[in-house]
Amino acid sequence: MVFRFLGNNNNNNNELPDQQLINEIGYLSNFSNEQLEQLLDIIFEFMIIQKSEQLLNQIQEFSNEHSINENTLKNIIRGCIIFFKSSAKNNLTIDHLREDCIQFKLDEEQSKLVSTKYKQHYIEISRSLVGNSLTINQVLDMQWRFGVTTSSSEFTKSNTTGSTFLQLKLVLDKGNNIKEDVHMELTLPQFYEFLKEMQSAKASLEYFN
């Protein structure tokens, strides 16, 4: 059993998620597709804009609408956030994410729904995660390379085949001699927008310092 979101490959020394996370993600299999889609929208919205008060209100509304215990729902969302963050950190492909969902006991249709939603929000999630990392960690190194999309590219649509994209790798200092690699895949307009946001954040930090 190989869980790709943990950075595992096909060797024999694969890490396994803890039982709590297995239970939290696996609980998604109890939802209808409509409920699952609604919950995923809530989770991805929070991961992108990170408004805790709004999330708590949405949890209460979802709990009341579908008769699900709020604490149970919070645990499910916590597990999903861990799963999606780790998937983005390890630059997981859509197929590998779908395979992980199946190993969490979601059926094929549910797994496809989760991976499709993840694909739709991948760029925004990655940008949000990198932005948060840059606010609390020193960047030790930055590497990038350009590529041209093909019809099989994970995060492109068929009408963007042949366009240029940029793969970005940041090496962050986590403290205590610990380093972390953060990966992103962006189109050029998205990269320039990301760069503009980082320059604005840098200017704000310099102002307050």
From Swiss-Prot:
GO-annotated biological processes = tumor necrosis factor-mediated signaling pathway
Domain COMM positions:
138-209
- A molecular-function term among this protein's GO annotations: NF-kappaB binding
A Pfam family this chain is assigned to: COMM_HN
| Domain of life (superkingdom) | Eukaryota
Which family, according to the similarity comment? Belongs to the COMM domain-containing protein 7 family.
Its job:
Scaffold protein in the commander complex that is essential for endosomal recycling of transmembrane cargos; the commander complex is composed of the CCC subcomplex and the retriever subcomplex.
Q: How does it assemble?
A: Component of the commander complex consisting of the CCC subcomplex and the retriever subcomplex. Component of the CCC subcomplex.
Q: State what protein this is by name.
A: COMM domain-containing protein 7
Q: Which gene encodes it?
A: commd7
